[in-house]
Amino acid sequence: MTEVLFYHLQDMTLENVLPSLLEKSLERGWRVVVQSTSDERADALDAHLWTYRDDSFLPHTTWRARDAEDQPIVLAVEESNPNRANVRFLVDSAPLPEDSGSYERIVLVFNGDDNEALAAARTAWTDCTTRGFEVTYWQADERGRWQRRD
């Protein structure tokens, strides 16, 4: 069964959070697709993942690359799954893909300071529960550690 994790960002940016979530995914041996909503945003995330920390390396590419199928992390703007990922991150209110049930895990990261993003996340939550997915809600505590909320 697909597990869907909703990560509620407040007073933090996707750029601050995404690298560590991707690192944890790679540690677990997962292949990942990160779906954003525009070419420009995917390119900005691509640039950020190369430079976010001097002592780190996240092997990744964009969906345009010829070797996308060989990479553990692919940044995309469409519902394709070029690297046969078992985990899909949805950012910037990217919609749930039609094949959501084919993933082990979907990670929906949304900006809780943006009313439109919050409304889109609520709609996605309802859609996921209707589809019978296991859904969990995560929010950072005052130290920035992710805590599951019930």
Language-model segments: which ranges?
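Long, hydrophobic N-terminal alpha-helical segment
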Residues: 1-47
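ASCE RecA-like P-loop NTPase motor cores
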Residues: 2-4, 25-31, 95-101, 123-131
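Structural motif
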Residues: 9-10, 36-39, 90-94, 111-112
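Short, solvent-exposed amphipathic alpha-helical segments in soluble enzyme
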Residues: 21-24, 48-52, 106, 123-127
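Terminal and domain-boundary regions
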Residues: 28, 45-49, 53-54, 131-134, ...
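Helix-adjacent hinge/juxtasegments
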Residues: 47-86
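Active-site-adjacent structural patch at catalytic or cofactor/ligand-binding sites
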Residues: 71-109
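Glycine-rich, aromatic-bearing surface loops/beta-hairpins
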Residues: 105-150
